Amino acid sequence: METPIIPSSSSLDRSGNSSNLLSVIPFQERTDSIIGCHFTLEIKAYHPDMMKSSEEGDVTLGSLYQGIHHIIRNKECQGLILGMDATHENKLHILALAFLCVIRKYEGKVSTYIERSKDTFSGVEQLLARIHIGDDHLGTYDPEVYQICGVEVPQGTYQLTLRTVLTPHNHTDGLSITLGIIVNSPARGMQGRSPMGVDVKRLILSFPKGTDPWTSYGEIKDKKGAVSKLKSILF
């Protein structure tokens, strides 16, 4: 895990002068936001091979991103909910942004809270891997604070839930994924807390070959309940 990036002040620093920012982001392109995130990532494996891979930690966030990217690109997303505004493009942007934070936090592994069980009705055995970062009092503070390098996030609270099923090649039933996200911009209650730095360009290079995420970063813009159309994000 890298050393957290320390902001030059408690407010959003958009000057690009902080010596702590990673040099991979060119000076003229730096637009940094300090956001707070709550995550719930739940992965259920049904196929024996996928259950074994989950137990051994072989299922990575990168491989999940590859499957999610494929589904989004083919417009097969189900269960997307966004609180701030309802445009499809903005949902994908927030999903990708939050997923970068998840990858940054867990460095690819999802083998947390592993439990085998049987479905109450069908009797089918399944394996549950669940990651949760959060608190019951979500309006009080953000349990994880991130400094996002290169992507500006307008002020507001974004709520997103993605539920989908990924079916691996030659498997009749594979992984069921629920990704629940709350993003607060700016982060709340962060006095004395150092945000973790999320270097968008570095993380994009770590994604599996062929996913081609964020070929253009685009922007998120407030426009009275709508946002400008994003440019090639996740497509």
UniProtKB/Swiss-Prot annotation:
Organism: Taro vein chlorosis virus (TAVCV)
Domain of life (superkingdom): Viruses
UniProt-recorded name of the protein: Matrix protein
Quaternary structure note: Homomultimer. Interacts with nucleoprotein and with the cytoplasmic domain of glycoprotein.
Record keywords: Apoptosis, Host membrane, Membrane, Viral envelope protein, Viral matrix protein, Virion
Membrane topology: Peripheral membrane protein
Subcellular location: Virion membrane; Host endomembrane system
Taxon lineage: Viruses, Riboviria, Orthornavirae, Negarnaviricota, Haploviricotina
Additional facts recorded: Most abundant protein in the virion.
Membership in a protein family: Belongs to the nucleorhabdovirus type-2 matrix protein family.
Gene Ontology cellular component list: host cell endomembrane system; membrane; viral envelope; virion membrane
A GO molecular function held by the record: structural constituent of virion
Protein's job: Plays a major role in assembly and budding of virion. Completely covers the ribonucleoprotein coil and keep it in condensed bullet-shaped form. Inhibits viral transcription and stimulates replication.
